[in-house]
Amino acid sequence: MRNVKRTIRVTTSDVSAPLAPPPQWIEPELCKLVTRIPAGEGWANEIKFDGFRMHARIVKGAAELLTRNGLDWTAKYPDIAAAIGSVKCRQAYLDGELCAMLPDGTTSFAALQGHGDVPAELMYSRSI
C-alpha cells in the first residue's frame, strides 16, 4: 500500500477571486416530533434556546436578519445585525436562534418580545 499525501494549495488569486453571493434564502432545518428517540450512532442533541429562529445573511460587512419564514427583521434588531455584520468574512449565511439572555444564564422569550430592557440579546448560530 502506498503512502499518499494530499496537499491543498491556496494562492492569493484564489482567496481574492470573486465569489458568487450567498443564497437569498435557505429553508431552515426544523425539529421533527417523533414518538421514539432514534437509536444508534450519528445522532446529536442541542440545547433548546427560547428565542426566534433566525438566519443571518452577511455580504460585504452588512448582515440581514431573516425569520424562519423569510421575513426581514434587520430593522427590528439593528444592533444584532451590526454585530453579525462585523464578523471578519467576505460573506456567510448563518442559521441560529436570536435569544434574550438573562443574568442567570437562561433565555427568555418574553424578554425578547419586550425588546426594551433585555439584559443581553444574542444570536446562537448552529450552522453555516
For each predicted feature, which ranges?
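Catalytic cores of nucleic-acid ligases and guanylyltransferases
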Residues: 1-128
